Amino acid sequence: MKIKKHIKVLVCIIISAVMFISCTNNDIADEGNENEQPNENIEQPNDEPIPASVCYTANESGSISVIDLETNKVVDTIKTDGVTHNVQVSPDGKILAATIAIPLVENTEMHENGKVLFYDTSSNELINQVEVGKHPAHVEFSRNGKYAVVANNQDNTASIIDMQNYTVINTIETGEGPHGLRIARDSILVYVANMGEDSISVLSLVNFSNISKKVIGKTPVTTAVSPDDRIILASLKGEDALAIYDMSSGNIDKVPVGKGPAQVYMQSDGNYAYVANEGTEESPSNSISKVNLGTKTVEANIEVGNGAHGVVVSDDNKFVYVTNKYDATVSVIDNSTNEVIATIPVEKEPNGITLK
């Protein structure tokens, strides 16, 4: 009898243990399932581009116009102390850089060392300034935010500015007459248009050197880089053309555009490029050439103001903004219709343009 009693107790213990383990496993499984459920309170990442809210123009008359893109009106004018040639907003949207050229003698082409002014975009107040080379043309931020690179047109150099402490940490020799530049998305290579020798210099932000040079065409003014860093564009003022350089094959195709092309800008998806056709002061052009980069043809020539110079496209590719140098205006183009929907008066001689 005692043996049977012990067996019954043992069976009860085993059954209880099995039930306990089963319940415990179910609880763990339920807890795991709960953890796998999405938390609606956590904001999910959004890959959609944020529409631009502010536009800045570099006015060579000595100012920066600040345009509210909700109203397409100038809401502020920042006075500078020299020829304001180009502007660029940092990748995080917090800093505006502007290149300032300082002529040695009024109304001459000879310059002393220029500078880059840095502004807080939340207040439009000056936060720092850095001396660079003679006649600084374009300034561009690396995508990682570490550097600002400046093309010094009369020094044949590029200044590398460390954005942590606002100091020039290196000066790299380029070709003759560097002007427009763009930095690859990997923040490693810089492509500089050398107006004086028909070439593009490729600079390294790793070892701060000029690693190569490519003959691209007559009088390249500015460059653009495709999203995959494989295609380089250059506006060729001396040929009235857009050069399309495929770095993987080495081929260069040229697309005829308007007279005296100045800046070129590529859509964020790499499908189209926009070339501002400036012409000359005596015979200004007034168009934007919209180039299909797949077919390498001009799909539209859009009439804007006289002396179209600077061009930028919103990240969502809905709008194109153009500075009209000889009209002192900015044209706003609806990219879906290729029509100008607004013309905004700014200060005299608007040149570079950027969005925040």
Residue ranges and their predicted role:
Residues 14-17:
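Alpha-helical transmembrane segments
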